[in-house]
């Protein structure tokens, strides 16, 4: 029996998560040279999301297919349609022009860099240089491992990665994770560095005050982990930008991640109503416990 579902991923999914929490979101990315999938993308972005794209020559719009075993939703294999070569210098200039236009009316920049050729080292530096609050997710995946690095994002305000990505970046299998967070924060001149650890929760390190914050994993049931990091980054970036207490910021974003893993892929955006109910329930329990 075959069943097919299709969702927005990556930056599109992040924008959908943000929609319930901000007045307006700008989305900048690239499509294939024939603008394939544009109709689908438009139909799945809400009215609060203003989008602009460049067309990448000799490339399709990125599609990632996962073939999943029906009973327990276990991934059997994946097939990617993409051209991960770098955008041309002309295409990058178009990106820079569009970015400058968006940034005039923006307070917060969220960069989701999946290593598929959109963001060069030079372009990453220009994003950081705009003096906005910049939060970054640099994902290591099967198509970019060995080539993708956090080093392009020196001086960003916030970076979120998972533990495997942290250990890969630092070339360390056994070092205490807190030591790695301190060292990487220093190397990249970051204030906030967050590492997610699956069932072990998440750790936030604030280099400014040299303090660690910890959160448990709140998901009772994990249907699919895809997109959990993006969901967490979306809301955590807002919280840290608004200078919400780090403990509370990490708690809120961890609850968002737990929402994300309860559905397949990026099928559902973070629900603000559900989040507030869960937060109220947790804080009530915590006050009673104390």
Model segments located where?
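Short, surface-exposed connector motifs at secondary-structure boundaries
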Residues: 19-26, 104-108, 188
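A structural signal for isolated positions on well-ordered beta-strands in alpha/beta enzyme cores
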Residues: 26-30, 52, 108-110, 135, ...
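A generic structural signal for short hydrophobic patches within well-formed alpha-helices
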Residues: 166-167, 275
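Conserved phosphate-binding/catalytic region of the ribokinase-like
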Residues: 86, 105, 112, 119-155, ...
């Amino acid at each position: 029996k075959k069943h097919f579902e299709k969702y927005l991923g990556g930056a599109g999914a992040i924008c959908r998560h943000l929609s319930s929490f901000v007045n307006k979101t700008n989305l900048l990315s690239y499509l294939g040279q024939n603008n394939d999938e544009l109709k689908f993308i438009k139909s799945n972005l809400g009215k609060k999301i203003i989008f602009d794209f460049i067309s990448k020559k000799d490339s399709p719009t990125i599609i990632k297919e996962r073939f999943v075993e029906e009973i327990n939703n276990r991934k059997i294999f994946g097939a990617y349609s993409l051209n991960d070569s770098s955008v041309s210098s002309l295409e990058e200039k178009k990106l820079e022009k569009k970015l400058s236009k968006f940034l005039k009316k923006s307070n917060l920049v969220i960069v989701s860099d999946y290593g598929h050729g959109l963001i060069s080292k030079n372009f990453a530096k220009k994003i950081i240089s705009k003096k906005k609050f910049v939060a970054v997710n640099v994902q290591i995946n099967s198509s970019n491992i060995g080539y993708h690095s956090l080093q392009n994002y020196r001086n960003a305000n916030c970076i979120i990665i998972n533990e495997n990505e942290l250990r890969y970046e630092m070339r360390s299998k056994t070092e205490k994770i807190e030591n790695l967070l301190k060292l990487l924060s220093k190397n990249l001149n970051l204030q906030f560095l967050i590492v997610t650890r699956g069932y072990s929760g998440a750790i936030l390190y604030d280099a400014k005050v040299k303090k660690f914050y910890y959160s448990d994993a709140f998901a009772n049931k994990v249907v699919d982990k895809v997109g959990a990091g993006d969901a967490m980054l979306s809301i955590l970036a807002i919280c840290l930008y608004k200078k919400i207490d780090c403990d509370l910021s990490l708690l809120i974003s961890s609850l968002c991640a737990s929402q994300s893993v309860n559905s397949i892929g990026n099928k559902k955006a973070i629900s603000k109503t559900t989040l507030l109910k869960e937060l109220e329930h947790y804080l009530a329990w915590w006050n009673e416990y104390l």
